[in-house]
Amino acid sequence: MYAEERGYGSFDNVIQAYEQIISQSLHLKRFEFDNGCFIEFLADSGTCETFSKGWISMIYWTSETDSMGSLTVDIGMDEGKCRTYRARGLLLCSKSITSISQNTEGRERILTVSHENGKLQITFVTIAKVSSEPELRNLGDLKFMEKFEKECRALDRKKHDDEHRKRSGKQKEKRKVEDIDKKKEDEKRKQEEKKRNDEDKRPDKKDEFDEPPKEKRQKSHHETKRNLEEQSHEDGIAPTSTTFVNGAVEGALSPCVSIDNHEDQQHDELDKRVYAQGTNREGLSNEDNYGNFQLNKSLEQLRARLVASSGEVVERSLSKLKERLDYVKDNLIKNVLECADVTVPSKCLSKTKHIEQKKQIVFSDCVRSVPVCEIKPFIDMRVFETETTQNARRVRQRTRTTVGSTDGAIGQQRVISGQNRGRARGRGRGRVPRRRNSNLNNLRTQNSAIVIDDSSETENFENAGSFNEDLLATTILETL
């Protein structure tokens, strides 16, 4: 037999906190100490450990005969360390000493606790039984000593292997946990790298908006075309028609309408340059810029078609107007010859300064000024009136008649409203006295008189029962 493990503990300033007798055979004691020291020996090596402030709990059980029992000692320190020792077997108990001797599988374990004069001692010893009693008698034999040492080394090696196996198991579990954490980190890093590569391969947003999908372009084009057609129907534009409606050519442009592509082209070029830079003047997005560019392009195409169709309509209208102009001239000469009595020079009847009223008609980018007063007095508007006109224009009763001619061959008559006081172009500034005779009453009853009434709604191109005199006058002048 030999002492395999030894442990010795000594504690100072020990105070018994309490003692509890749970039953006649079960007791519990608790002690507190200020400092202590514990020394352990294993084979040929030992360790020493000191403590400061802690507690000791001692639980022991005794049988009815007080010959058997068990003892458990727990030591706890304020630093968070703890130790425990236990033994079960023969019991030796006194007032200050409690000792247990346990014999199992060739090993004997002894645990002793003593408390006296403020000190507490703990002794823990394990004794290994190697050989039988007859062999112990021959301790002086060399062979026996070699065998004994060999067995001791085997026991030490076994204990060392057990401890190593225990430590390696803990390390293996620790490495397993570390491997799992490392694997998770690697997967997370790979996912981040993959996501970053996908973002690098993805094209820029600007390139995505530069060329929208074909379906989107077709849809935008059809929507723009449909909106333009609806707007043209609402505005009453019918550029392909050449019929006369209430004396006006349907599809003809108003004198105040001007189509100038120069300014729009400048704006389109500016929009294209700004769109190429990725931003618009109003700060719109690329998608909005593309929509505006398509809309401007559609408007430009519509404008070009409108100008081309308007030119064709005007040419056809002029050809028809020329035929009607010949008819108007014949009626004009006939009416003047019938109504003329006195031949005097033609003069302006206006008392105010002569102001030539000029209006513009624009069919393309070319703009030309036309004096309306040169051709306006020679138009008989009743020739262009249709039979279905229900709102006949009223002719004012107050008229002024001037009949004059230098050669006496042709006379002229005018019925001028009070609102138009300008003199005709090409007349002298002299005044001709008004002559009232019997022809005046006859002139009022004639139906072929040439009437120009600025008070009527002739300037309104959209009125159903009116006709644009300025447009007709300008068209006739261009034809002549």
Swiss-Prot record:
Biased composition (Basic residues): 422-437
Biased composition (Basic and acidic residues): 156-165, 175-215, 225-236
Cellular location(s): Host nucleus
GO cellular-component term (any): host cell nucleus
Residue segments, region Disordered: 156-241, 417-438
Main location: host cell
Keywords for the protein's UniProt record, in alphabetical order: Host nucleus
Protein purpose: May be involved in DNA replication.
Family classification: Belongs to the herpesviridae U79/UL112 family.
Name of this protein: Protein U79
Gene that produces this protein: U79
